[in-house]
Amino acid sequence: ALPCPYGCPLRCCHMTDGVCLRNKQGC
C-alpha cells in the first residue's frame, strides 16, 4: 500500500496505489 497525497480524504484514497480519487463524490 502507498500513502495518498497530502490533503486527500481517506474515503477518496485508493490505498493500493496511493491515488486520490478526485472524481469520486465528496472528494
Swiss-Prot record:
Tissue expression remark: Expressed by the venom duct.
Places the protein is found: Secreted
Domain of life from the UniProt record: Eukaryota
Disulfide bond residue pairs: C4-C13, C8-C20, C12-C27
Primary location group: secreted
One Gene Ontology cellular component annotation held by this UniProt entry: extracellular region
Keywords attached to this entry: Disulfide bond, Knottin, Secreted, Toxin
Coiled-coil residue spans: none
Molecular function (Gene Ontology), one example: toxin activity
Record comment regarding domains: The presence of a 'disulfide through disulfide knot' structurally defines this protein as a knottin. The cysteine framework is VI/VII (C-C-CC-C-C).
Name of the protein in question: Augerpeptide hhe6.2
Species in which this protein is naturally found: Hastula hectica (Sea snail)
